[in-house]
Amino acid sequence: MADSSFDIVSKVERQEVDNALNQAAKEISQRYDFKGVGASISWSGEKILMEANSEDRVTAVLDVFQSKLIKRGISLKALDAGEPQLSGKEYKIFASIEEGISQENAKKVAKLIRDEGPKGVKAQVQGEELRVSSKSRDDLQTVISLLKGQDFDFALQFVNYR
């Protein structure tokens, strides 16, 4: 019987992030508590820019955006939001969407699979993803449930299960 395998990746669909951003912008423009405070959210190149005239309003904009991301099924671990910064008369928060698994994080996951996973399961780092293979599909299911039970500081998705 051939080896079964799956890939562990950390990817976010840009279209879903864009949809969440548009929904947040619409809610911000319509909510009464955001009237007259200059609150906005938009793309600024590859970063997301949130603006308002007070620190608590700009953090409220971030909360609205985070709630829209959750509703669209995007993990908040993929969102890297900075601290509110005063810029002129406005507060700004720059946020970015993190994609890919770094080498050190991939090594942590591979070590966890080797140490706590079933015997005969191999994990190989391939760029920004991790390939896990085994002769038994049951072992792969065990590895998936093991990883879902862990609390990593980055989002994980399991793809190409074969």
Swiss-Prot record:
InterPro entries: DUF520, UPF0234-like_C, UPF0234_N, YajQ-like_sf. GO terms for cellular component: cytosol; nucleoid. Keywords: Cytoplasm, Nucleotide-binding. SUPFAM superfamilies: YajQ-like. GO terms for molecular function: nucleotide binding. It comes from the Bacteria. HAMAP family: YajQ. Nucleotide-binding protein. This is Nucleotide-binding protein SCO4614. It comes from Streptomyces coelicolor (strain ATCC BAA-471 / A3(2) / M145).
